Amino acid sequence: MFKKVFGNKNDTKPLKILLKCILDIEAKEIEILNPEILGSSYYDKRTIVDLIVKLEDGTKIGIEMNTNVNKYLIDRNLFYMFKIMSHDIKKGKMYSSLNKHIQINIDCEGKHISPIERYSLMEKEKHKILTDKIEIVR
């Protein structure tokens, strides 16, 4: 049902509303990408994300709806996020061309302190953000 409502390429309005509610962004142009991420080898783990969205500024958003939460959920979603990122830069391109990536994990159990929690890579003691290229939302 989730993919049917939010993954419709012909009607992206529900997806834009979802992104507005979760990320507080006004997405004017969005492109729903192929959710299957192919590996470079036959032996690579097959990866199918619920939704992969590309915004007009190049930001890519992986969205996962999780009905059964387990202790490896975050690890799995990190894996998905980095797989999406690994396809961003092609041979000969500069690392500076890496786009921002956001992984949204919608957890149906909802046992979080606040309705939306946003995480980034930051230094532990001084809380200095290392990069704005990665964000995890749950």
Can you say where each PLM-predicted feature lies in the sequence?
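Elongated, amphipathic alpha-helical interaction scaffolds
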Residues: 1-138
